[in-house]
Regions:
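Short acidic-aromatic low-complexity motifs
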Residues: 2-35
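A solvent-exposed, acidic/Ser-Thr-rich amphipathic alpha-helical stretch
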Residues: 26-79
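Short hydrophobic/aromatic-rich beta-strand segments that constitute the beta-sheet cores
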Residues: 39, 83, 111-112
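Short glycine/serine/proline-enriched coil/turn segments at secondary-structure junctions
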Residues: 77, 90-94
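Short, positively charged
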Residues: 3-5, 76-83
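Short beta-strand edge/turn micro-motifs at domain boundaries
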Residues: 97-123
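Short beta-strand segments that buttress and anchor functional surface loops
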Residues: 83-90
Length: 123
């Protein structure tokens, strides 16, 4: 699949980061993320699909039923997409909100930057 940067950003919210099964998520990461991908978030830097899968597994342990909702228009420029989002229980107010910037290279996510508005479990 040669997805656009905005499509890859939506896959993060709708599929990858809500997947509870680490094996299924690993397959999704292999399909959509570059091998040397980088995720920078309030807790630090994670390099590679395996590290991102481990971090996503930890997030799902804390918030297994939470879903992500895009709350702004997705803006794109060149191979970068960005948007604001919120996360929480379906039908409830958001527990936390943030902004993501995603960079695409050769059809895959190469970099993901996550800014979170509230302090969570990362210190």
């Amino acid at each position: 699949m040669n997805a656009t940067s905005s499509e890859l950003l939506m896959l993060n919210f709708d599929v990858i980061f809500i997947e509870l099964d680490p094996v299924k998520r690993a397959a999704l990461l292999a399909e959509y993320y570059a091998e040397d991908c980088l995720w920078i978030h309030p807790g630090g830097r994670i390099v590679g699909r395996e590290g991102i899968n481990e971090a996503a597994t930890e997030i799902r342990k804390h918030f297994p039923e939470y879903r992500y909702t895009v709350t702004s228009e997705i803006q794109t420029m060149h191979n970068v997409a960005t948007c604001r989002w919120g996360s929480g229980m379906p039908g409830q107010p958001f527990h936390y909100t943030g902004t993501d910037f995603l960079e695409k290279r050769d059809g895959h996510v190469s970099r993901l930057y996550t800014f979170i508005d509230q302090q969570l479990f990362w210190s």
